[in-house]
């Protein structure tokens, strides 16, 4: 299957990086190479781009899309490791970093990946298929209380307790092996009148995917390490697709902009914690009405940008 992914907020993200033609940039989530291609167009032969992705299918697709460009380095890894990746490449500082935290259209559309609740497939949801831990492990081995917390905290699912109980009850008969089986369990757990508000499995699938790929744990550290690797005036641009991610980015940016922990009554700062960034987007940038109509998957996207000081 061809790797397809429509880059969200493409123009806005590229503009936010304030690209210098001889700069060094990092695309932490290479995907199909959409954002990377626009960055490369603006770089001279002295500029450089590092493209990171934990999905080998994404890297293969990007290499084909970007075959005309020589100043890109491909890295099969998780952007959680951005610090060690740049260390290994002997790169100290960079001028801009982008993170697009969405699941690619390819990953959603390829049934075998197990991300989609619309297609029956083995329970998988691994971004990195070289990892052993998958959605199957979460669904079939987690205790009921663990499942409840994941569905509640990562999926913001109001019926998380009931869904967790139904999953545990069902798997005592036989292991739950496919997305179709899981969807049926969720349908039985959620009252019919609440199933009119979008697909009933959406929040549960989101929660399990986040748990499988440790997405929220990765994000905090990745933001801190990225800011540390930016040159002065370098930009960090992050696209999120649900409120949990957006909240983490918003809070972390605020912490880095105003890190002082002194009591408000202190006349001067004595904690020694200095601001590292300036937030550029006081409110997140969202897709235009036109983009939302063209690409329905962009509807929940939000772009937040900061500048290293």
From Swiss-Prot:
GO CC list: cytoplasm
Record-linked InterPro entries: RsmH (IPR002903), SAM-dep_MeTrfase_MraW_recog (IPR023397), SAM-dependent_MTases_sf (IPR029063)
Keywords: Cytoplasm, Methyltransferase, rRNA processing, S-adenosyl-L-methionine, Transferase
Class of this enzyme: transferase
Location(s), subcellular: Cytoplasm
Coiled coil: none
Positions contributing to S-adenosyl-L-methionine binding: 33-35, 53, 79, 100, 107
Pfam family, one: Methyltransf_5
Enzyme Commission designation: 2.1.1.199
Keyword set includes Transferase: yes
Domain of life of the source: Bacteria
GO molecular function terms attached to this record: rRNA (cytosine-N4-)-methyltransferase activity
UniProt catalytic activity: cytidine(1402) in 16S rRNA + S-adenosyl-L-methionine = N(4)-methylcytidine(1402) in 16S rRNA + S-adenosyl-L-homocysteine + H(+)
GO BP term, example: rRNA base methylation
Physiological role: Specifically methylates the N4 position of cytidine in position 1402 (C1402) of 16S rRNA.
Family: Belongs to the methyltransferase superfamily. RsmH family.
The protein's name in its UniProt record: Ribosomal RNA small subunit methyltransferase H
Naturally occurring in which organism (per UniProt): Clostridium botulinum (strain Langeland / NCTC 10281 / Type F)
Phylogenetic classification of the source organism: Bacteria, Bacillati, Bacillota, Clostridia, Eubacteriales
């Amino acid at each position: 299957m061809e790797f397809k992914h429509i880059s969200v907020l493409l123009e806005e993200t590229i503009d936010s990086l304030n690209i210098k033609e001889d700069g060094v940039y990092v695309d932490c989530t290479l995907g199909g190479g959409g954002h990377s291609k626009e960055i490369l167009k603006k770089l001279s032969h002295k500029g450089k781009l590092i493209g990171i992705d934990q999905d080998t299918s994404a890297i293969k697709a990007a290499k084909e899309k970007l075959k005309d460009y020589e100043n890109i380095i491909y890295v099969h890894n998780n952007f959680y490791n951005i610090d060690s990746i740049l260390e290994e490449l002997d790169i100290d500082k960079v001028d801009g970093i982008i993170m697009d935290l969405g699941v690619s259209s390819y990953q959603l559309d390829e049934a075998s990946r197990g991300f989609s609740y619309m297609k029956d497939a083995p329970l998988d949801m691994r971004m990195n298929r070289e990892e052993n831990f998958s959605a199957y492990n979460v669904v079939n081995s987690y205790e009921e209380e663990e499942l409840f917390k994941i569905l509640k905290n990562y999926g913001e699912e109001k019926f998380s307790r009931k869904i967790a109980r139904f999953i545990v009850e069902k798997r005592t008969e036989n292991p739950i092996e496919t997305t179709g089986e899981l969807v049926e369990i969720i349908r039985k757990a959620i009252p019919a009148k609440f199933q009119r508000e979008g697909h009933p499995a959406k929040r549960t699938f989101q929660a399990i995917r986040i748990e499988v790929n440790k997405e929220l744990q990765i994000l905090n550290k990745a933001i801190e390490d990225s800011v540390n690797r930016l040159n002065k005036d370098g930009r960090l641009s992050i696209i999120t697709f649900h409120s949990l991610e957006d909240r983490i980015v918003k809070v972390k940016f605020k912490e880095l902009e105003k890190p002082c922990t002194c009591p408000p009554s202190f006349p001067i700062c004595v904690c020694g914690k200095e601001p590292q960034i300036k937030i550029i987007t006081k409110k997140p940038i969202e897709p235009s009405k036109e983009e939302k109509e063209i690409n329905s998957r962009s509807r929940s996207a939000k772009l937040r940008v900061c500048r290293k000081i």
